[in-house]
């Protein structure tokens, strides 16, 4: 139990240290419901703020979600994520540092939006809300990619960019056909600097359950 709580706090500390809460999540009360594991290869995992070469991240990575109820210990019950077999998820990758950390004219830049994902082992955990722990990859059958994956390509000399993955639970019974359209990658199509997934997620009533991120730079 304590390990889960410690990991949740370590995640929050990392979000704060690297400006993820302030610049992307926009919710200082956010508590992760589990771990979003992201791996480009065995030698290129995403690890809460590590640095990866851009060439290692050209193809879409593999994802796994590990739910741990104890990570939500300080979350009000009304706001806690309770797993259900029919849950649909949206996976996002966004860059809040486009074209640089001091120039936000393209920020956020949308790199991936994949919706209507299901847990691959959805039938192996309870639906009573008593589930304490499970780990699952995602079933992409029937999923809908709104924005195709684009690997990191920060402008030369623009400094390190944060590439942030976010896992959202979609509202019950709502698939992505009901979501607002993403008109462009820069600013997520809103045309306003420093605008992106937070606004889009709020429009579509998405619940953030986990996040991970890495840095990449073109020197």
Swiss-Prot record:
Entry keyword tRNA-binding: no
The keyword Transferase is assigned to this record: no
Gene Ontology CC terms: cytoplasm; fungal-type vacuole lumen; fungal-type vacuole membrane
S-S bonds: none
Family, as annotated: Belongs to the phosphatidylethanolamine-binding protein family.
Note: Present with 1030 molecules/cell in log phase SD medium.
Protein name: Carboxypeptidase Y inhibitor
Gene name tied to this protein: TFS1
């Amino acid at each position: 139990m304590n390990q889960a709580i410690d990991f949740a706090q370590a995640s929050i500390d990392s979000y704060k240290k690297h400006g993820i809460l302030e610049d992307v999540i926009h919710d200082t009360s956010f508590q992760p419901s589990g771990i979003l594991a992201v791996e480009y290869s065995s030698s290129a995992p995403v690890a809460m703020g590590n640095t990866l070469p851009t060439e290692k991240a050209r193809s879409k990575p593999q994802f796994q979600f590990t739910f741990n109820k104890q990570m939500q210990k300080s979350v009000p019950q009304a706001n806690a994520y309770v797993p259900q077999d029919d849950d649909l998820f949206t996976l996002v990758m966004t860059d809040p540092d486009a074209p640089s950390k001091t120039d936000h004219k393209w920020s956020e830049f949308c790199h991936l939006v994949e919706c209507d994902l299901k847990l691959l082992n959805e039938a192996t955990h309870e639906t009573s809300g008593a589930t304490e722990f499970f780990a699952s990859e995602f079933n992409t059958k029937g999923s809908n990619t709104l924005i195709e994956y684009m690997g990191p390509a920060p402008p030369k000399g623009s400094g390190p960019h944060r590439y942030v993955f976010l896992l959202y639970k979609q509202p019950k019974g709502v698939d992505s056909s009901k979501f607002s359209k993403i008109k462009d990658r820069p600013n997520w199509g809103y045309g306003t600097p420093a605008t992106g997934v937070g606004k889009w997620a709020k429009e579509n009533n998405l619940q953030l359950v986990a996040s991970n991120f890495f840095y990449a730079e073109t020197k």
